[in-house]
């Protein structure tokens, strides 16, 4: 996990020095890379859930935050002869409509989508199982993604799965469950807590913890 982080962080620093990208909030960049690494290492868990559901004859929707994860899942599904199609930011509007229609008509079993591109405005009621491989930071985005299977015409209970890997996912879950503008996160099994007035402040606190604890 941390080896992957170091590789991706080194690549970010290289691009920064080469002028390929503009300087920004390094704390937010680090938290993004930590989440990308977490996303990658949850792939096997999501694959296990999908295969179990397919064995039961179910269709399933999988939403991810990161394009690399979507592409890796698509590659794995194709190698296992699992029928799947995806909608991401670059998918043309007409193609999106066709993909949704094919999924609704059960032409394929696994719908892959990015939270931003596939999590809004689509009707995916052919599935009663939805995997949020990566939970977005904001409750609104998470709810929009879940609502794709809860649309009008859905008469069955929808099951939502949230694969979780370690501290970073635990923190995101706590933020989503928080009902207050002030965020208070306590890590299980560790005497560590974060208190922040907003999400950006929280992210900086998290990065400081990872820097002190793991030397990233």
State each model region's role:
Residues 59-63, 71-74, 78-118, 141:
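Conserved helicase ATPase core of P-loop NTP-dependent helicases/translocases
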Residues 122-135, 158-162:
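A short beta-strand element within the Helicase C-terminal
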Residues 44, 71, 75, 97, ...:
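Alpha-helical elements of the RecA-like P-loop NTPase motor core of helicases
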């Amino acid at each position: 996990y941390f080896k992957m982080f170091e590789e991706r962080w080194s690549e970010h620093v290289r691009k920064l020095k080469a002028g390929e990208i503009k300087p920004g909030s390094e704390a937010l960049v680090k938290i993004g890379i930590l989440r990308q690494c977490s996303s990658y290492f949850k792939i096997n868990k999501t694959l296990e859930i999908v295969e179990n559901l397919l064995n039961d004859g179910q269709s399933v929707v999988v939403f991810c935050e990161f394009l690399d994860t979507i592409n890796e899942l698509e590659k794995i599904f194709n190698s296992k002869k699992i029928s799947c199609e995806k909608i991401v930011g670059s998918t043309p509007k007409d193609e999106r409509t066709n993909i949704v229609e094919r999924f609704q008509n059960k032409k394929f079993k696994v719908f892959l989508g990015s939270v931003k591109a596939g999590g809004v405005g689509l009707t995916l009621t052919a599935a009663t199982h939805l995997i949020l491989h990566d939970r977005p930071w904001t409750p609104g985005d998470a709810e929009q993604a879940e609502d794709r299977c809860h649309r009008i015409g859905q008469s069955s209970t929808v099951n939502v799965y949230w694969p979780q890997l370690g501290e970073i996912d635990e923190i995101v879950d706590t933020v989503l469950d928080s009902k207050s503008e002030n965020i208070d996160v306590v890590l299980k099994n560790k005497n560590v807590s974060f208190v922040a007035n907003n999400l950006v402040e929280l992210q900086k606190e998290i990065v400081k913890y990872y820097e002190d604890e793991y030397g990233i």
